[in-house]
Structures are given as structure tokens and as C-alpha cells.
Amino acid sequence: MIKANVYSCSKFRFLYRRRFLSQSSFVHSLDANVSSLIAAVKSCVSIELCRLLHCKVVKSVSYRHGFIGDQLVGCYLRLGHDVCAEKLFDEMPERDLVSWNSLISGYSGRGYLGKCFEVLSRMMISEVGFRPNEVTFLSMISACVYGGSKEEGRCIHGLVMKFGVLEEVKVVNAFINWYGKTGDLTSSCKLFEDLSIKNLVSWNTMIVIHLQNGLAEKGLAYFNMSRRVGHEPDQATFLAVLRSCEDMGVVRLAQGIHGLIMFGGFSGNKCITTALLDLYSKLGRLEDSSTVFHEITSPDSMAWTAMLAAYATHGFGRDAIKHFELMVHYGISPDHVTFTHLLNACSHSGLVEEGKHYFETMSKRYRIDPRLDHYSCMVDLLGRSGLLQDAYGLIKEMPMEPSSGVWGALLGACRVYKDTQLGTKAAERLFELEPRDGRNYVMLSNIYSASGLWKDASRIRNLMKQKGLVRASGCSYIEHGNKIHKFVVGDWSHPESEKIQKKLKEIRKKMKSEMGYKSKTEFVLHDVGEDVKEEMINQHSEKIAMAFGLLVVSPMEPIIIRKNLRICGDCHETAKAISLIEKRRIIIRDSKRFHHFLDGSCSCSDYW
């Protein structure tokens, strides 16, 4: 019977969404039995259909049968019609605890914690005086996660203790999650430690909340502990652990988790393998991403799109286009996310005509209306190609209000081409949209500095100070010995600093003698002398990280560096030179994309 109901539910949804039946004829065709009507209500997607089903219920069966009244209440709430739900609930001849829980659950699903408290109060003072149970409090906690205050959460905690429901592991897990989301890890850990029986969800929750609070390494410690006490990881475990690997940026750790995924029999799980593919890409291992993708049996649209995103982020636009065409060839329908990555790939590779073609194809062939992300990509594509007025024209023609992402793309292009007039317009709009984002002020200041407008640049920097905005400091990260090493500008804090600085001098000497290289001091946007500029630019964090990488990373392995800001022009040229002189492969991920340096060239073709 249960299988039949599930089948019926999916069948009803299919028929209705495909519009094989009109709403009225769809309802008329239903058998007048409780099981069929409950299945139809559960799959209901419109208020019109809900009302027709409500009429069918009134004419055909009684609210007393099969909890159908509860299902209708939940349906009305799910569709945003609170008044109808409340009216129906009040008209129900018999209301048990399930009925009250349905009402609370409906409000919880929409984050209406105040309404949940109101219904809970009514429930307890009603004639019968129902006692809240595990289901009641799970809904309450869920609503609290949406946006409840700490006081409200603690109030629910107190009620749970009062009614003796804190022994239920599901309720405790929900509280562990809620306290973690509020940043109160002490309370989460206390609840976890006090649990007499910790299930896998308990351990998974501890991994996730530590990750969310910037403690990925501590979360992984809970993962290891869960395995030691005999819990086998499931899909949720691996997804959380893979996110932790991304946060920590340790490739060897990711490879170890990959082995556990294979050993645990999850290599056929498309959700996990897609996350693994994405992780390798973000860690600079594009080849590993490709290997994982090609090992997936019948990859779905998410896997195809993830691989497309990998090519885009790494700047391999032509490969991204080939991948997209192959995806379409195999009958996988692209969605708006697919086109965002495809247009991004075109933007990162300077493929203007291709980008225009796919932007047009998206709406004409696939009936996908362009969204803000698509316009951001197109503005970036046109702007970085030097077509600043075309980019600005596209913004003015947009059918919706341009977002900060759109104006940010234009401002970035203005920085490249030193267009102070258009850059000022873009920055002013960004100041309105994102008044607390210091990056926009820094960008405009840099545009003025690059154009020699030192007074204007100083004015913007002073404006930043007045607003209390702080410029983010540049730092670079590199993995070695299962540890992430961090470097900042002019960094001498590392134990191997003397060796690093010696290597840095050696590199500069080779670059000058073998290539006649001169530092690109125009990228130092400070009104100081040339000698000072050269000294400043030679101590950028990514250069220090590259020197360290040359010392410790095996020649058989690429030197992979992460930079929190955009790589500067001189560091970009230096990386190309080092890759040629030292015959090393260098991969740098900055705030925008990956750069693959080999034999004196970069994968971005200097288009970045």
C-alpha cells in the first residue's frame, strides 16, 4: 500500500506538471478514496489545485479519515495561504496531536517561529490539553534555525527539558545543530558529550557545525573519532568532510578521503563524486577532476556542470566549450547554472564572439531568460576585451536592476584599461549597493593611482578611513608536509625565512641575467620612488610562496599557491619567468581564477 501511494504521488505530479490534464479534470479523475486524495494533496503545487482537492475531500470523504485534514492544512501553509489553513484547522471536527503538529510544522517550514509558539500555547491550553512530543519540538527547533533568537532557542530548550523530550536523540541532534549555527559551540559540545547514544547524525552534525564556524580541522577530528567508535560514514558524512578539505586546502587529505570513498563503496554515488570532482578543481588539481568525471557512469547534469565550472575557473575556455557541446550531444539539458559557467569560461579566455553566441543561444534555443549572473559574465567578457562602452550599454539595456556583481565586473574592466570616468560611475553605484565593502573603494583608488591621479586616490583612501573600512591584507598559502604555510608581504616569520629570501634573490638574479627582466613597478600604486617601488614589489606574498615552493615541493609535482586577492601584474610575469627558468609548473589561484604557468606562459594568455 505504501509503495502504491508513493507511485500514485509521483504519477499525479507528473500528470499535473506536464499538463496532460487540466486542474479540474485532474481532480475529477481521482478515485474518491483517502489514499488517492492524500497522495494528490502531498504533490499539490498550486493554490487553485489545493482548493479543488479541498472541495473533492468535502464531497467525497470525511476529515476524520486518513489524516487528510492535516494534509490539507499543511498544503495551504506550504503554499502561503495561512488564513485558509487556520480556517480549515478550526473547522476540523476532531483534532489530535498530529493535527496540531501539522499546523506547527507548516509554520515552521516558513520560518514563522512566533506562530509556532502561538499554536503550541493554544495546543497545551485546549480542552484536551495535548502534551508536545518529539515531532512538535523538532518543528520548533527547525523554525528557530531559520531566524530565531538565542533567547527563543533557549526557551524551546527549557520546554524540551520540562516535558522530558531531551532523551530523544533526534531532538538533541537538532539542538546541537542550532547551537552550532549561533556560534555557541560550547553548548553544542556539552549536549553531544552528554548523549548516551550518539548516532551517525550526531557525529555528522558535529563535523558540519565546526566547519561552519571556521574549525574544519576540529570537524575532521570528530570524523576520525566517529570511525574509531565504529560508525561507517554515509553520504552526508563524506559531503561534510569534502567541504572541510576544501576549507583546509590540503590536497593529501583530499586524496585520503578519496580513498575512503572508494573503499566504502561510494564511488558510484554521483552526489559524492561530483563534490569530489569540484574539490579537486578548487585545490588546483584539474587533471584529477577530469579523472573523477570520466570515472562516473552516466554522469548527470550536476556532474557535467561541475566539470564545466572547473574548466571555466582554470581558464580553459576552449575545453569548456567542447565539454558543453559534448554534454548537449549526450542529451543533457543545460540550465541557468550551466550557462553561467559557460559564459564565465568565455570571459576568462577572451572568447568574445563565442560568449555572445551562447548568451543568445541560451534564450533562443533553451528558453532560459538571462539572470543577473549571466549579465555579470557578459559585462566582464566585454569589459576585459576593451569593449567598455559596449559593456556599459548592456548594463543600461538590462531588463532588471543591475546588481553589485554587474557593476563590479565593469569596475574591474575599468581598472584594466584605466578608464577613470566610467570607473567612477561604476564605483559610485557600488558605494550605494555595498556601502561596507572596502574592496570597491580600493579598486577605485587603484584606478586613480594607475592614472597618476594621486589626490583622487588619496581622497578615496581617506573616505575609507572615515567609514571605518579596512583594506584586506594580501596573503598567499602553500601546502607542504600536510600543513598549510601562510605568507604575507615582506614575511620573515617563517622558520625557513633566510633560505626563502636567499632563493628569492637567486631567482631575481637569474631573471635579470637570463631574461633581462625588469620589475613592473607600475603595479605599485603608491606615490613613492622607483627604488622603493621595486623593493616593495619584490616582497609580495606570492613571490615568497613561490620561492618556498621551489625549496620544498618535488620537481615532479606542481607548485600550487592560493592568494586571497587578485595576483598583481609583476607577480604574474615573475611566475611565467620562474616556470621557464626553473622548468617548473606553477599553479596560482587568486580571488578570481586559476593561473597555470608552464614554459614561460600562462593558461590565461595574459587575459585576466
From Swiss-Prot:
Cellular location(s): Mitochondrion
PROSITE patterns: PPR
Start and end residues of each stretch annotated as Type DYW motif: 514-608
Record GO cellular component, one term: mitochondrion
Signal sequence, renumbered to the chain: none
Region: Type E motif, residue numbers: 406-481
Gene Ontology BP terms: RNA modification
PPR repeat segments: 30-64, 65-95, 96-130, 133-167, 168-198, 199-233, 234-268, 269-299, 300-334, 335-365, 371-401
Alphabetized InterPro entries for the sequence: DYW_dom (IPR032867), E_motif (IPR046848), Eplus_motif (IPR046849), Pentatricopeptide_rpt (IPR002885), PPR_At4g14850-like_plant (IPR046960), TPR-like_helical_dom_sf (IPR011990)
Glycoprotein found in the keyword field: no
Entry similarity comment: Belongs to the PPR family. PCMP-H subfamily.
Name the UniProt record assigns to this protein: Pentatricopeptide repeat-containing protein At5g40410, mitochondrial
Organism of provenance: Arabidopsis thaliana (Mouse-ear cress)
Source species taxonomy: Eukaryota, Viridiplantae, Streptophyta, Embryophyta, Tracheophyta
Gene (name only): PCMP-H15
